[in-house]
Amino acid sequence: MRRWAWAAVVVLLGPQLVLLGGVGARREAQRTQQPGQRADPPNATASASSREGLPEAPKPSQASGPEFSDAHMTWLNFVRRPDDGALRKRCGSRDKKPRDLFGPPGPPGAEVTAETLLHEFQELLKEATERRFSGLLDPLLPQGAGLRLVGEAFHCRLQGPRRVDKRTLVELHGFQAPAAQGAFLRGSGLSLASGRFTAPVSGIFQFSASLHVDHSELQGKARLRARDVVCVLICIESLCQRHTCLEAVSGLESNSRVFTLQVQGLLQLQAGQYASVFVDNGSGAVLTIQAGSSFSGLLLGT
């Protein structure tokens, strides 16, 4: 009977005794540990290796999935790669590049000075002026024409000789348009019979006259005087003294029987005004203007 009682006690108190034994063994292990030491946490090794720069690869949990495992292993392989001196040298040389330069990548461009900027500005101003001037002329030019159209121009010759008495002023008339190639008569401003060119519009005109003067009557006579001269004039409205005129003066001391007297220049005419050629004989003998003497004019612009 007593045996059965002890057996029942052992069955009931056995688990409690085993638990008390485990607790006692743990306390004994803590007593035997040195005072300066402390137990490392389970992840102490991983933390130390991460502080050294080479983290250990913890085992990925099974619930992370294959994608997370592959990415994690790739990162660890990159961190644990061998020390490549060439790669480090290349990266180091890249860091040594100057960082104080602004602008797009590449070698620096040429230095731009104030003189260069001024020259470029002058070129731009010149181009703008040419474009503006071309735009002003476009309405006056026919489509597709690259040259300026001359609206009024003429070249005519004296049809016959013209006698000029001494001390007289004579207006030349009786011109004709030459039939030879090269002569021209453009516009309707010239009257060949009267020898007058009437301006169709107000503008600046260029005129010229080339007269062949015959002074054969003076040869063999008394010595020429200082006032024995001949003048060729191109006058406006036949008023040579009131308006501006083109004038050429020549003496009569030439040894030849005939000499040529020329005059040319620019005159501004208003619409309706005319210009013509005059000969002023200041000598004491009769002069003759030979046939073939020419008179020409051209409208330069308005």
UniProtKB/Swiss-Prot annotation:
Organs and tissues of expression: Predominantly expressed by adipose tissues.
Matching Gene3D superfamilies: 2.60.120.40
Glycosites: 43
One term of GO molecular function: hormone activity
InterPro entries given in the database record: Adipolin/Erythroferrone-rel (IPR052136), C1q_dom (IPR001073), Tumour_necrosis_fac-like_dom (IPR008983)
Domain of life of the native organism: Eukaryota
Region of interest (Disordered), residue spans: 28-68, 86-110
Stretch forming the signal peptide: 1-20
Stated family: Belongs to the adipolin/erythroferrone family.
Full protein name: Adipolin
Species this protein is from: Homo sapiens
